[in-house]
Amino acid sequence: VSGQGTSGTAVQGGTETVSATPTTVATNVSAEPSANTSPTQSSQEASAVLTNANQVTPAVPVQSETVTEPAHEGQTVDMQILSTTDLHTNLVNYDYYQDKPSQTVGLSKTAVLIKKARETNPNTVLVDSGDTIQGTPFGTYKALIDPVAQGETHPMYKAFEMLGYDAETLGNHEFNYGLEFLDRMVKGAKINIINANVRNAQTGDYYYNPYKIVNKTFTDTDGKQVTLKIGITGVLPTQILVWDKANLEGKVTVDDPMEAVKAIVPKMKAAGADYILVAAHSGIGDNEYTKNEENEGYQIAGIEGVDAVATGHSHADFPNGDGTSFYAKYPGVDDVNGLINGKPVVMAGKFGDHLGIMDVKLTYTDGKWKVVNSKAKLEKIDTKSDVADKDLIDMAAHDHNGTINYVRKEVGETTAPITSYFAQVQDDPSIQIVNNAQLWYAKKQVAGTADENLPLLSAAAPFKAGTRGDATYYTDIPAGPLAIKNVADLYLYDNVTALLKVTGAQIKEWLEMSAGQFNQIDPNSKEPQQLINSSYRSYNYDVIDGLTYKFDLTQPNKYDREGKLVNPDASRVRDLAYQGKPIDLNQTFLVVTNNYRATGNFPGVKDAAEKRLLNLENRQAIIDYIVSEKTINPTADGNWSFVPNITNADIRFASSDNARAHLSGQDAISYVGPSTQAGFAEYRLVVKEKANQVEDTTKKESEKSPKGVEMTDQTKRETPKATVGASVAKPAPTIQLSNAQVVILPQAQVQETQGSSSDKALPNTGSDESVSATLAGLVLMTLAGFFGIKKHEKN
């Protein structure tokens, strides 16, 4: 089959046809193998912790070379579509943060299910819905420490090739290491990488192949072979232009996902597609549509001509199969049979923990293949067994071992455990350490500049806080030696430090947005009330250190989870003070944060007068800080709390059952009992009256503030100042980012400590090398992508 897309002529070869060729990055425009192969890794290189695992051979992809007879009237085929998503470099079944094997993650585990499914029905299509090459220290290692070179294949894409994936679409996190890095990964891949809504900003052409027609030879119900032309396309959220603004601005544009699919389906039909599958890096969303929404899976399933949708991005599971899915409440959602708007839809969780399976019966009628019936389901990996795919483990062994050596490098020690079990309900050491490190680093970066005397604050959020129903998704670092794996557990994402110049009024709006983390509490109710808004992502709950403040939870949230103003007169932020005095809403502050926040649309941030992207990852700043301090005493300064007008309320929240071991000294938190969610428990928070309240001195300030800004009592306590070094940074040239100034500061000037070396030294996993020399090299490794290496979304 050949056809013409909007940006190029189709390329035909072997058993597959590329339906459109982008002008910028070509992926697999020939069916012939590429010369860009990765060296085969020996099984003897496999980590010792894995050699005793029970292993199986990899699933063998269905071959499509057989010459078949044309389809005939009444011919019936039973096809299955297999789907993975949001693998986030979980290739080997290993937890790099805990430094031990894990049976709850890994494509090496999912591959066992893929083989089983193909044995059940060889008429199989296999796709992935994105967020593949970023997410664990394995991803960091292959991007920054031992980066995949030009012409090499990323281990994740090599695994897809080995398993016979028919196509993969890109996710938002694919862009975290910069467009140049992604271009190199796409060119080195020997699988079909597709996307239909990212365009070249200069030409308007598709940046990637917008779709692929894959000729699949299936066996019909009578045992005869027949070829079907499966059209596969993919889309991702338009929000990548915000999340990776520094990487993408002026280089690409992004079409609305639903509109992009609507536009490409007729082209796929014209190219001969018998069946159209959308691999959407998009959550399911809901039944209400607004253009450029982050999650449009529901709407995509309703597009005429779309036959099936493999969703992702939200790290959720669909279908549940019993009508209990979160999405079951929406019209047109059949959670029992896995249908949305009459089409089979799956979302296969995250990290390889599920395989999506869509079963489709097709009959050839009136010259076309027509769907007779469809259904979808999820199959969970076997978490009780260590069975994994041997060939994938062998292929990844060299990079897997390199990652382990990298994360085991010691950088300091902690006198007490560092956990995030209670980081959403009280000021917490896990966030305090990040803020202390950011202040330590930023102070040196502004020393000797015109902004040297501006008040300096720091913002950080709890990244691992049981997000999306995962009771294992918390930071849990034991007392004792601290290694890079622990810092990666503490600071999950490959963000880059950034400085914002904002006013006191903007800081208040920033905190109002953060306060969306909490549900509104009725102070008069005697019924249990849940404190945490589960729909709000914990990585958006910024704690700003250098100030003191309280949250009034009797008030509604001012902004929704997307940052949209929903209650203009609401004011949850009270007693906002700097150095013990009510904050001046007109005063200018510097806030050190990360590039994800700095380039986003967060209230109070998006209108910052100046945004400076620095030259060092946040994680590396933490490493350097720990190296400098040598020993960390994990305590929080208690700079925020709740207004004590809910002291009689029964306030509950969920956290891991493992948090029970850390209740000692937590006089405001108590264990209630097990949760209905596996691995979680319910806890009670008691908000106590605070002593030493002082006279309300904020009235004059609030009179100057915009409508809705209200601040009352003030505490006498002065926020502790961070200990900083004495290095001096020179002013740097300025460039423009949107309407704000962006200053590229000189390469990070890390204070010299005993045993340190030149910051030009590359990272080294040898135990005899200096820790500082080993880690300072990450600065240079980061330079190529520092403009926007960031987190995601995760969702």
Regions found by a protein language model. Give the residues of each.
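Acidic, metal/ion-coordinating pockets
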Residues: 67-380, 449, 456
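Catalytic centers of hydrolytic enzymes
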Residues: 77-80, 90-98, 103-115, 119, ...
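Generic signal for short, ordered secondary-structure residues
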Residues: 67, 165, 240, 247, ...
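Functionally constrained cores in energy, signaling, and assembly domains
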Residues: 50, 117, 167, 216, ...
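Short glycine-rich loop/turn motifs that provide flexible caps or phosphate-binding loops at active sites
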Residues: 105, 129, 134, 170, ...
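Intrinsically disordered, low-complexity segments of exported/surface proteins
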Residues: 1-100, 106-125, 129-152, 157-158, ...
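Short secondary-structure boundary micro-motifs
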Residues: 66, 151, 167, 197, ...
